[in-house]
Amino acid sequence: MKKGLVTTIVIAVVALGIFSWVKSTYNGMVEGEENVKSAWSQVENVYQRRADLIPNLVATVKGYAEHESGTLESVISARARATQITVDPDKLTGDAIAQFQSAQGELGNALGRLLMSVEAYPELKANENFKELQAQLEGTENRISTERMKYNETAQSYNTTIRSFPANILASIFGFEQKGYFKASEGADTAPKVEF
């Protein structure tokens, strides 16, 4: 009788320990996944801010730079493409992020061409509204870089958790999948050639 009671208590303690570990590990993975989704939301938020600044920037430039209609149209169409691509936070795969990043990169390149063309219009560069929009755009680009970095850090922490043993067993059972990362743009590892 005493031996049976001891065995039952030992089994109950072991079962409780396993249950506690499963619960703790599962909840940790859920928290990690929610942190990744939150970080992704912030990335989308700052990209949306940039997209929202573009119509005002285009309208300001249009008033001064009538000969830049091709550049303005490329910015408008790049903005349209960039805002059409959405990524489901539950499916943050490397391919989905690469597609999103590509569309946003096109928009960034078009904006860069627009800002370069402005150099030919000194009265536009002196316009207070344009200077304010340019400053806001610069600040937004900095925020984008920061939020992308935070997203990558959060995704890396989550991916490490779900790939580590023995949590990877539970991740597989409960369907937790790795999240993709933002990657450096092609050619970013090569320094630009500067000649004087």
Name what the model sees in each region.
Residues M1-F196:
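A helix-centric hydrophobic-segment signal that preferentially recognizes long
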